[in-house]
Design a protein with these regions (language model features):
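Domain-level signal for soluble alpha/beta catalytic cores
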Residues: 2-320
């Protein structure tokens, strides 16, 4: 179906993989707006910027630059990015009522759809995703949250994303098993397709301790494989490459959204400026991974990346 003119599936449906079809996602939206454009992001939240006309213009330019890359390389797009912090605890810290937070999340999705509409004839398929961030800080262990608490907590935002008719909810920068299981249970009950993107640290493991294979195996076991797929994000290839093995479980991993820099995450946060790394090298590393695992079909960027990085990634992951 078409929604707002952009080519999307709607009806909370995420399409199966199709040979030759690749998706390009957004880059590191928060770091780009903070350090490239100079906007303040309390609690690292983007959606409040929808109340700032200057920020709306810059965000429009930013998302168009991502979609221009998809159009240039003739790949599909899986686009989102304003609602990472649009969950109850973060909304309360930002001064939003539950009703106001839900409305802000709906406005975030509509903003993305309006931008996507401009590229409906240039990109072979545009899907819209809502981003579900962890309840706590992504760089903490977040070990205290239980599966049931996570299910209750994330149900709030997932209900809003279902109402927004997103093609996918992406639980992104998750770093422990119980919260991942809880958000998967919530999505399954509500009826929203869910991807889970896990973040690995410099030890090539989740910050809470398990390896990538241990986490995916455990989550799938507890959820009867209800997540549509898994991804890796907020990690540089030097961090996640040692965790990737040529075994059956890796087929559950459909994509990667790497950080631009090789620096350790906490050190990166303390820099106070944008660390863009080496976009050419990043693209080549992603290309190497794509050739080894051609089933991976979702590529994008995370902290420190923007359209230049996405261009290098897209150029390299398109396997002839």
């Amino acid at each position: 179906m078409k929604k707002g003119g952009a080519i999307v599936n709607g009806n909370n449906y995420f399409p199966p993989q199709k040979e030759g079809r690749l998706y390009l996602s957004e880059g590191g939206t928060e770091t780009e707006l903070m350090y490239k454009y100079g906007f303040d992001l309390p609690q690292f939240a983007l959606f409040p910027l929808l109340n700032n006309p200057d920020a709306v213009l810059k965000m429009g330019e930013m998302f168009r630059s991502y979609l221009e890359v998809a159009a240039k390389h003739k790949v599909s797009a899986l686009i989102g990015g304003l609602d990472y912090r649009a969950s109850p605890d973060w909304g309360e810290l930002l001064g939003y009522s539950p009703e106001g937070l839900a409305e802000a999340n709906l406005q975030s999705i509509e903003f993305i759809r309006e931008i996507a509409n401009e590229y409906a004839s240039e990109i072979p398929g545009i899907l819209v995703q809502g981003l579900v961030g962890p309840r706590g800080d992504a760089y903490e262990r977040n070990e205290n949250i239980t599966e049931n608490e996570a299910e209750d907590y994330h149900s709030v935002q997932l209900e809003t994303l279902k109402k927004a008719d997103v093609d996918l909810a992406l639980a992104i920068t998750f770093n422990n098993i119980p919260e991942s299981v809880g958000v998967a249970h919530a999505a399954a009950k509500i009826g929203v397709p869910l991807g889970i993107s896990l973040s690995l640290d410099s030890s090539s493991k989740l910050n809470s301790g398990p390896s990538l294979v241990e986490a995916i195996t455990a989550i799938d076991k507890e959820t009867d494989q209800s997540p549509e797929f898994y991804m890796i994000n907020c990690s540089h290839p030097f961090e996640y490459e040692p965790a990737i093995e040529p075994d059956d479980w890796i087929n559950r991993v459909r994509g990667v959204r790497p950080n631009a820099s090789k620096m350790e995450k906490l050190a990166l946060c303390k820099l106070g400026h944008l660390e863009e790394g080496d976009p050419v090298e990043l693209g080549e590393l992603c290309g190497n991974l794509a050739r080894r695992y051609p089933h991976m079909d979702i590529w994008g960027g995370c902290c420190g990346t923007w359209n230049s990085h996405l261009d290098e990634i897209a150029k390299n992951v398109i396997v002839p």
